[in-house]
Every structure is written in structure tokens, then in C-alpha cells.
Amino acid sequence: MKKLLLIPIVAILTACSSTHLTPDKAIVVQPLAQATATPERPIKVTVMRDYGAISGGARQYHILDNGKIIASLYSKEMTTYYAEPGNHALSVGFGKNGEDGRINFSEFKLGEEPELHVGWDGVNLYINRMK
């Protein structure tokens, strides 16, 4: 009986977490800022919103880079923006100022193309650099 009870619990917890998104399955949206490369901002940064079935799935997530809103993404969406080399405080949250979310500190270097994934792990928001 205990094992039978575990099946729906595991199913619910699995549905609450996000599933990793790949670029070929993503819906591309334009960034709200820094949409084109410039000599000051040559680094192409891709942000993908992983998708979840229940918890956090319908909410819009706001992506900020050093306090500046870059994009607002729904489930299965991705955006690409251009950033300057150096240290960046990347945050994801439900509010447009990002105070209710998570922060990832990362250094962007010339010649690299960082890829970030944001989503919901069943308990909290996350923002992870994948490359």
C-alpha cells in the first residue's frame, strides 16, 4: 500500500519541476534590450526558459542583467541578447525588478557565447549557466 501511494506523489513532484529546453524546440522571442551586437556589447548570450507542467509553468519570468530587464519569458521561450565583457549579475524573478527571484553571478569573456537556463525546480526559481 505504501508503494502504491508513492506513485502519485512522485508523479506530482515530477510535474512541478521544469524540463530542460533545447534551442530546436524553443519559441524565439525578441529581447527587450540589447538586441544587436555593438563594439561595446559583442558577446551573444542565449537565455532559455525551461518548461514545467504545473507549478510555475504559466507565470512570466523576467530576466535581468546587472539590474536591467532583458526579457520576459513564458514557458518554452528563448531570447538572445548582446552583453559587454566582464562580470554580470543575472537574475530571474516574477517581478520586473527581480527582487523575488534568484541571482547567478557570471563572467562573460570575448569569444564565448554563454547559454543560460531559467525555470522552476519544484521549490524555487533557478538560473543556471550551461556553457
Where are these predicted regions, by residue range?
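Short loop/turn and low-complexity linker motifs enriched in small/turn-promoting residues
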Residues: 16-131
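Sec-dependent bacterial lipoprotein signal peptides
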Residues: 1-17
